């Protein structure tokens, strides 16, 4: 199993042919598939670096924590990060910085979470080179006492041409939650493809009616929609899927 454990805010130094870890800096040297699990953390600071021409599929998992985290992703020439991330925490304040430093650097960031307490996510995506691509997808379920805030900045400065950027953030509320999405794109170039979408709401009555018309009761219908929503943003193996299903079953019985 290619697992990286962040325990008490620290990662043990380690090196193999695919990666090196020194002082909470993870550097991927070859194409690989890894998972990061956060345990007993409250103040996380890590850097994740992809060298030239490296393709990394990464899964991040964090559950039942009260945590402040700062995570920086640095992506070099022709490197690609495919990230799937699942959180279900008590309270979170997270800063995410994605630096697309290389020519044709690419990130595909897919985040699903269950918001139980108070959460704030600040994203800064820097397109620091030409032909770089960012695709950011956030899907959150905000429970009755939850409160969530997404602040997302995509930055493209003059001189970096033919870039593509996308922000897609959706929050499903259960109750009268205070949820906020602030999508921002700061672009100083004409030759660019840029798109953002922000939605805050509930599961549609049509979806619920369809499921209930098939003989599924209300609670089970909601649970099916929750599962579909969470997993629509994640590509994970059966072990990870089972772990996430256990969390879903905890809140939707």
Task: Identify the residue ranges that each predicted region occupies.
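Short alpha-helical scaffolding segments that buttress acidic/His motifs in well-ordered protein cores
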Residues: 224-225
């Amino acid at each position: 199993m290619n697992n990286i454990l962040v325990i008490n805010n620290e990662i043990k130094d380690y090196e193999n042919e695919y990666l090196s870890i020194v002082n909470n800096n993870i550097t991927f040297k070859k194409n690989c598939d890894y998972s990061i699990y956060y345990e007993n953390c409250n103040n996380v600071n890590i850097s994740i670096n992809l060298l030239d021409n490296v393709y990394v599929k990464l899964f991040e998992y964090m559950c039942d924590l009260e945590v402040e985290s700062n995570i920086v992703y640095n992506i070099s020439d022709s490197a690609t990060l495919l990230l799937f991330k699942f959180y279900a925490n008590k309270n979170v304040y997270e800063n995410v910085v994605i630096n697309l430093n290389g020519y044709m650097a690419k990130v595909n960031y897919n985040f699903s979470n269950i918001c139980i307490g108070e959460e704030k996510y600040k994203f800064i995506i820097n397109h620091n080179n030409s032909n770089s691509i960012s695709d950011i997808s956030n899907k959150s379920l905000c429970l009755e006492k939850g409160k969530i805030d997404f602040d997302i900045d995509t930055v493209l400065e003059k001189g970096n041409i033919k870039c593509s950027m996308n922000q897609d953030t959706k929050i499903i509320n259960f109750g009268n939650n205070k949820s906020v999405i602030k999508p921002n794109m700061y672009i100083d170039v004409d030759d660019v493809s840029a798109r953002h979408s922000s939605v805050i709401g509930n599961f549609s009555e049509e979806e619920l009616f369809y499921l209930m018309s098939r003989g599924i009761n209300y609670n089970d219908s909601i649970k099916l929609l929750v599962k579909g929503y969470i997993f629509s943003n994640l590509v994970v193996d059966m072990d990870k899927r089972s772990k996430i299903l256990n969390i879903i079953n905890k809140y939707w019985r």
